[in-house]
Regions:
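A generic secondary-structure signal
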Residues: 53, 82-89
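Active-site metal-binding loops of divalent metal-dependent hydrolases
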Residues: 66-68, 100-102
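Solvent-exposed loop/turn segments connecting transmembrane beta-strands
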Residues: 3-4, 72-74
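A structural signal for well-ordered alpha-helical segments within the folded catalytic domains
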Residues: 6, 44-45, 77, 81, ...
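Metal-dependent phosphoester-hydrolase catalytic domains
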Residues: 17, 74, 78, 87-96, ...
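Structured beta-strand-rich core segments of catalytic domains in phosphoester-bond hydrolases
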Residues: 1-60, 165-167
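Hydrophobic/aromatic residues located in beta-strands of well-ordered beta-sheets
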Residues: 63, 96-98
Length: 184
């Protein structure tokens, strides 16, 4: 249900720095308000969102975290379109951050839909400094080297990225992605 069982895409944040003003989930499918498989997806997939306020500066932004289907090509493309629509639907036109396991690399249709939307930009592409000796997909083989990035961090134009890094010396099979974001 996205809360106590099944798929969930948590957003971890510093409670001493940020306040959550509003939050929720929606399912990556034609029916967004309850768990279900969308389009050609193999599993129900979810996107969690929050509206955050920086306690010190008052800067307010949206944060989305998702997990796209690992098989359904149509599901991933439609999920990308759905995310863009959800961002546009918010009554306040706030800056937005979109992260997650997209289950496809930077050459895929769903990636291109997001990065070419004019709304979201890949933090990897716009970073002033990039540390990425390896991609984020290794097929569960930690020693495999690849340029393939399946975990992405997209931003709206209000953000600039000073430093971007893919940290492959973690305990996970899929590497963490890190970008230092600053609003203009």
């Amino acid at each position: 249900d996205g809360k106590r069982a099944g798929e969930h895409s948590a957003i971890f944040y510093r409670t001493d720095k940020f306040e959550v003003l509003e939050h929720g989930d929606f399912w990556l499918s034609e029916i967004t308000d309850r768990p279900n498989k969308g389009w050609d997806a193999v599993l129900p997939r979810i996107c969690t969102w929050g509206e955050f306020r920086d306690k010190q500066t008052g800067f307010t932004f949206l944060f989305f975290n998702l997990h796209m289907d690992h098989v359904g090509v149509q599901a991933r493309a439609e999920s990308a379109k759905l995310i863009l629509e959800k961002i546009k639907e918010f009554p306040k036109k706030l800056p937005a951050i979109l992260t997650g396991d997209f289950n496809v690399d930077q050459t895929s249709e769903s990636y291109q839909l997001l990065d070419g939307s004019g709304i979201m930009r890949d933090s990897y592409e716009i970073a002033d400094f990039r540390y990425a000796p390896n991609g984020t997909f290794n097929g569960f083989h930690p020693d495999r080297k690849t340029d393939s990035r399946i975990d992405h961090l997209f931003l709206t134009k209000e953000f600039e990225v000073k430093k971007y890094g893919i940290l492959t010396d973690t305990y996970r099979s899929e590497a963490k992605e890190s970008a230092r974001k600053e609003q203009n």
